[in-house]
């Protein structure tokens, strides 16, 4: 993967294992951009029952894969962290400590000025149900129907992002609004069929209006 990027890139590309491995000058303005990155970060799923969260796990019984519930040691921590929600039995919560660690790393960057923006499939309030998507060749699959050459992804909790960076006054906008708010009028008012087709494509209207749930989250730090 790295070799392919280096061969095709016309500019110098550096790969880092940790964000702190990148040498940042305090006088630099850092731009952090990602597209469909955070939805690839694995989340654990928890189900609420009788005042506590149980972790949803995969088990095998008689050669068949099944979902089971197991005691979650962090149940109390989850209830506290998401205390603005009143959970009911069978509500599903998706939570990732890895995601929290990445956000903490970004928040603790030592540079005085940086701009952060990311675009991903997500939500601004907990859906209280599973958002796990399994795709193969751009087609949705059912859980356990296929195990090779598949992509697993979770919808991104942008409410968590917003709370994490609340002091930076973050902005959340869906892709459809982002396109229509920033595209020059000459294109928006165009009657050219090809132009209209491209606008429908990039705004998400072509794909079941996915542009409404494909969100952009941005903020800047300027000290």
Where are these regions (language model features)?
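A short SAM/SAH-binding and catalytic strip from SAM-dependent methyltransferases
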Residues: 19-20, 27-50, 91-97, 101, ...
């Amino acid at each position: 993967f790295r070799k392919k990027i280096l061969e095709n890139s016309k500019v110098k590309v550096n790969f880092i294992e940790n964000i702190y491995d990148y040498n940042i000058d305090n006088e630099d303005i850092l731009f952090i951009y990602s597209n469909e990155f955070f939805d690839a970060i694995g989340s654990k799923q928890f189900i609420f029952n009788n005042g506590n969260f149980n972790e949803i796990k995969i088990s095998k019984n008689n050669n068949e894969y099944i979902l089971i519930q197991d005691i979650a040691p962090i149940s109390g921590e989850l209830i506290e962290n998401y205390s603005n929600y009143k959970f009911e039995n069978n509500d599903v919560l998706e939570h990732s400590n890895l995601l929290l660690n990445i956000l903490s790393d970004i928040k603790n960057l030592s540079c005085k000025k940086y701009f952060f923006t990311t675009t991903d499939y997500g939500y601004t309030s907990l859906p209280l149900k599973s958002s796990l998507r399994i795709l193969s060749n751009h087609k949705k699959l059912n859980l356990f129907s296929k195990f090779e050459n598949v992509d697993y992804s979770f919808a991104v909790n942008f409410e968590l992002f917003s709370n994490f960076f609340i002091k930076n006054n973050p902005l959340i906008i869906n892709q459809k609004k982002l396109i229509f708010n920033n595209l020059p009028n000459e294109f928006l008012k165009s009657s050219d069929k090809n132009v209209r087709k491209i606008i429908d494509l990039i705004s998400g209207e072509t794909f079941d209006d996915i542009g409404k749930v494909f969100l952009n989250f941005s903020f800047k730090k300027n000290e």
